[in-house]
Amino acid sequence: EAMLPRDERADVGGIGGTVAANVLSLAAMRATLGEVLTDDAFVHMISLGARFEAGVADAIERHGLPWHVTRLGCRVEYLFRAERPRTGSDAAAGGNPELDRLIHLYALNRGILLTPFHNMALMSPATTEADVDLHSGVFDEAAAELAERGAYV
């Protein structure tokens, strides 16, 4: 127990270290950049990011929740607070670990895996509109249940 992180927001799952740039990793990186992350793939991923953002924003507005969603290209994240953080410190201070865990478990029980440590999704070349729409429906259900119970802050 003495070795456990004291801060629930501690990043214990990052990737790094001296062996992160080995030959296999570099070959995989080169293949990904040359064969997977093409211009067409980015058009697809960014379009899905906009769709994901719209689904989350619609649920937040429809249920009157003091939350927000932010998108940068194909990366979309929602935070359970009204104000958008301006710095990393703002984001950390505005976290809600209990609500984060709840939404992750709620989504996981319905077939959706969110990025660990925050409520973020990255659209990939393999992501489909059906994947995004599934998340939008599940997020809307969770938002409705939380709003109904007043358990959203």
Where are these regions (language model features)?
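Conserved N-terminal phosphate-binding loop of PLP-dependent enzymes in the Aspartate aminotransferase
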Residues: E1-V153
